Amino acid sequence: MPSDHGFLTSLGLEFAYFSGLPWLRGRRASGAGVVMRFERVRPARAARFQPLRSHEITPEFLDRTIRALKRWKFDIVSMDEACQRAVRLASPRRFACLTFDGGYKDLITSAYPVLSRHDVPFTVYIPTAFPDGVGEAWWLALEAVIARETRISLVMDRREQRFDIANTPEKYQLYDFLVDWMRSLAPPDLSAAIKDLCTRYAVGLSALSRDASMDWSDLAKLAADPLVTIGSATVNYPVLSNLKDADALREITMGRAVAQAAFHREVRHFAYPFGDRGSWRRQHAAMAEEAGFASAASAIPGVVESEGRTNLHALPRIAWDGRRRSLRAMRVIVSGVTFAPVKRARATGA
């Protein structure tokens, strides 16, 4: 839902653009480049309730983004190349690496035609339960329930709770509240909670999750393209910080093993599910390195530094807010001017 905070942030980015600040910042302070994080790419919708709008861009905006990055003299590179530039001496040109999380079906139907037309490399991170047809996109199911109902009830902490959601602001408020609650649950409890909610309100969790996700045939098409890097995002896409260490390591290693078996190639790159600061911890970076990944991408914003100053197993990414359509705002963000300087990375095992 649009907010005063979002408006002020956008206004600040526009002001920064016209102030010339991105061009006054030194080349070293701007980093070697940026890794950009996208999720869904699909045509704009007219629905008033779109709690995941910030996670979506249109194919037209993806096209504008790629054209702009080229115009701004960014080299659009693969994840392998991004990791190499992160440890080398600074290059005269900055890079941009395009990544897509979630394994959504619209990547193949809406994003891939745009990416192919521009002949640019990109990385897609796959939680392998979803192409297997057994993943649970609980955030989509929650959206479907709240969008359709004016009153819902569910069991929270062993107590029946009821919520009136007669208008759109109330729907947004409840969605945010329940997402925060569900993200705090251990995976078995989260699965039980969303299945109970879907049963009560006749939302087909399994069908919805399958329909929203690429299957293995879609992924095989992508894997056949030399410009596409297939990465892993665990098996079930859990909040790793809610798991015991042994379970988290199993999710990380099994996700890689399943993907490698499916594509008959090494899977070198990983993305933390959700990826924000609360969803993973330092020990998970060590696990990703132990599992054999060359990189592990977060959703923590920042630029990638050269000369080894960025920890490749805590790789920052710029998650673009799909509610923003200003390329001026994007140019400010990719300049690095909005991010604090990065301290030299230490080995994850230290």
Q: What kind of feature is each model-predicted range?
A:
Residues 2-99, 106, 137, 141-145, ...:
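C-terminal active-site subregion of NodB/CE4 polysaccharide deacetylases
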Residues 27-33, 37, 135-225:
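Extended, charge-rich helix/loop segments that form flexible
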Residues 43-46, 174, 198-201, 229-234:
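Short, basic/glycine-rich phosphate-binding loops at helix/coil junctions
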Residues 110-128:
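A short alpha/beta connector and helix-capping loop motif
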Residues 110-114, 218, 283-287:
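A short acidic, amphipathic alpha-helical/loop segment
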Residues 125, 230-232, 297-299:
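Active-site neighborhood of phospho(di)ester-bond hydrolases with catalytic His/Asp-centered motifs
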Residues 128-131, 301-302:
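Short beta-alpha junction loops
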